Amino acid sequence: EYKKFVYAGHAGATGDAIKMVEGLDADLINMDLVNTQPNSMILPSGLGQYCNPGVAGAYKAGAYMVNQNGERFFNESANAWDLMQAMKQNEAQYLIMDQTAFDNFNAGMTNSKIYTMEDVEKWLSDDYDGQPVMKQGATLAELCEKLNLPADAVEASAKAFNDCAAAQTADAFGRTPAAAQSEEGPFYALQMHIRYYASLGGLHINDSMQVLNTKQEAIPGLYAAGEVVGGLEGDVYMGATLFGWAIASGYDAANAVNAVIAQ
């Protein structure tokens, strides 16, 4: 399942520490779990990139997502976990934006130094065929033609969305749009993906930061800290928590080693 997601982690996160302890019978936990997140684009480098700074403003201005059939499929403003489960059912999904939503999206992304407007100009060029997939059309129909999406389905999705925005009522997915999408172009689309950073699994340690073997015994002289340790997050990654863990676990591991040296 994870092979169809886009990698967004550090280039150096290659699992070397796990390989180093293979001959020590080290116990590994949660190695079947991976940190995955929605709201992602693919950068020209091929790496996944979170788009949270951009989608927040875009959704407030009437942006929405459609799948490969041109249909909306979920509440785009829902929590990340539920949105990701819905995205997993699609072959592809695209964020559809009018000019205001597109401007808001780019403002959030450029203010976060993720890319520049010069990048956007390049990506929108008709002769650009790399990542990210970002397209522009004078009308929704023209935009759909560039994406090979059924225009009638996308236009129907837009009408249903705008009707709910005008009435300020929740749509079939439970979202009450804060604003309608403009009926006048241009319109923009960005292909969205699920990204993953790293495994949520790793080495099994005890309270003294010692690595355990498969018999749950401490391996003499072997300590671990940071992302190489498994089990901190359970089966769901909680955003930004690993920063604190990196500091705290490193501190505890160093203190544990110093205590042994001092004996």
Feature map (PLM): residue ranges:
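A conserved FAD-binding loop/helix module that cradles the flavin
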Residues: 1-20, 190, 229-261
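An anion/pyrophosphate-binding glycine-rich loop and adjacent beta-alpha core
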Residues: 18-20, 27-149
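Short, small/polar residue-rich loop motifs at catalytic or cofactor-binding pockets
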Residues: 58-60, 197-199, 239
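Short, glycine-/Ser/Thr-/acidic-enriched flexible segments
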Residues: 69-72, 78-81, 99-103, 195-197, ...
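Function-dense linear segments that define catalytic or interfacial modules
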Residues: 97, 105-120, 221, 232, ...
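A glycine-rich dinucleotide-binding beta-alpha-beta segment and adjacent secondary-structure elements
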Residues: 153-236
